[in-house]
Amino acid sequence: MAIDLRPFIPFGRGALSQATDPFRAAVEFTLMPMLITNPHLPDNPIVFANPAFLKLTGYEADEVMGRNCRFLQGHGTDPAHVRAIKSAIAAEKPIDIDIINYKKSGEAFWNRLHISPVHNANGRLQHFVSSQLDVTLELSRLVELEKERKTLSIETARSKDQLDYIVEVANIGFWTREFYSGKMTCSAECRRIYGFTPDEPVHFDTILDLVVLEDRMTVVQKAHQAVTGEPYSIEYRIVTRLGETRWLETRAKALTGENPLVLGIVQDVTERKKAEANKALVSREIAHRFKNSMAMVQSIVNQTLRNTYDPEQANRLFSERLRALSQAHDMLLKENWAGATIQQICATALAPFNSTFANRIHMSGPHLLVSDRVTVALSLAFYELATNAVKYGALSNEKGVINITWAIMEDKGEKKFHMRWAESRGPEVMQPARRGFGQRLLHSVLAEELKAKCDVEFAASGLLIDVLAPITPEVFPGMGHNVPEQRIA
């Protein structure tokens, strides 16, 4: 259904009377879904919706006209996004925002929404104009070029201003290029994206000078490809005259003939490229952590089977140790894998024992954040040591206690981390004939992750473990060298 724009856009006399009107052509050319609302009517209703909007949402014109745009919202729409839009409209300010909207079919989609107020010559608000872009599959989809046209008339200043208005509202720059001469005509938004002044003459070489050297040849090849009449799309980097590197995406197509004219659009996609790079980084980090987790699981399996010959007991031990590993991962997930404090690690790993042995497990020390790998190693070590204490140590009788302390101390002029596990008032302990899983965790995994020295003493008063490690940013994230010294008595 064609919708008349004349009641809402200030054209001159007879501006829409011709089928080849460049403004109408530009609307069809970009296929940009657009709405116009009237804030002077109750509830700021829609008074214009172009065919692209109807196609995007699946609604008919009579289903949207006269309604507030909120009908596109649904249960998945973030209330904070809705509040931001309301605030911008109330303040008569433009806003760019990504929001979840819903089509008539009920299908949700990410809508890159741009809303801009339109004022008259006296500065009075007349309408709100909005453009939409479905960015569900990609963060920044550009408008496709329309079917080939013989000419795109920009003969009058009025027509050119109207075309610039549309592409600027959509944050998309529009340009034309004479294929053989390289002379270009650019919209105001296009000039802003490239950093050109309003009156500066623009040539293809002017743009090419901004393109980074690594991307320049590809841009030239794509530009020459346009003469075939086939549309092309390219992403490339430029360095602005202010020295800022930006990612741009251009889509173009040539109107072939005796004097080919290339029509194109350009959009700044720097933020999208940053998001893609961050996504790739996160994917690599997830893969790395998965490998580390699998290595830890394999180690638990090997150590459990090596020291346990009873299948039922091995299965029980493996399940308990795997549960401890899972609790460590849950703790890291809550902290976005930024590590955890030693206090958090102790509390989580020893929670199953505190309920049974109330007031017999004590912990104290400063707030110290350790890396994710150390978090896992400490969690398993604490759990295994507590399990052994229940079987053979301080928690195997009615009065034994465990004291876990940690501090920063000076060792030979160097700040170091000192942690102690001290059992007392339990039965006399003796050094086992061979190392169990707990000792292997201390001497292999924990010592390696902390770059630490681990001393284990089977004293008559109870098990005593001292861990001494250097202060490094890899192990203690964010910790500087000016750490107050705190000794363990």
From Swiss-Prot:
Post-translational modification: FMN binds covalently to cysteine after exposure to blue light and this bond is spontaneously broken in the dark.
Coiled coil: none
The PAS domain, residue ranges: 19-93
Keyword terms: ATP-binding, Chromophore, Flavoprotein, FMN, Kinase, Nucleotide-binding, Phosphoprotein, Photoreceptor protein, Receptor, Repeat, Sensory transduction, Transferase, Virulence
Enzyme Commission (EC) number: 2.7.13.3
InterPro entries according to UniProt: PAC, PAS, PAS-assoc_C, PAS-like_dom_sf, PAS_fold_3, Sig_transdc_His_kinase_HWE
Catalytic activity: ATP + protein L-histidine = ADP + protein N-phospho-L-histidine
Gene3D superfamilies: 2.10.70.100, PAS domain
HWE histidine kinase domain, as annotated region: 285-367
SMART domains, alphabetized: HWE_HK, PAC, PAS
EC class: transferase
Residue list for modification Phosphohistidine: H288
Residue ranges annotated for the PAC domain, each copy included: 93-147, 232-281
GO MF terms held by the record: ATP binding; photoreceptor activity; protein histidine kinase activity
Residue positions where S-4a-FMN cysteine is found in the record: C69
Known role: Photosensitive kinase that is involved in increased bacterial virulence upon exposure to light. Once ejected from an infected animal host, sunlight acts as an environmental signal that increases the virulence of the bacterium, preparing it for infection of the next host. This photoreceptor protein is directly related to the bacterium's survival and replication within host macrophages.
UniProt-listed NCBIfam families: sensory_box
Protein name in the entry: Blue-light-activated histidine kinase
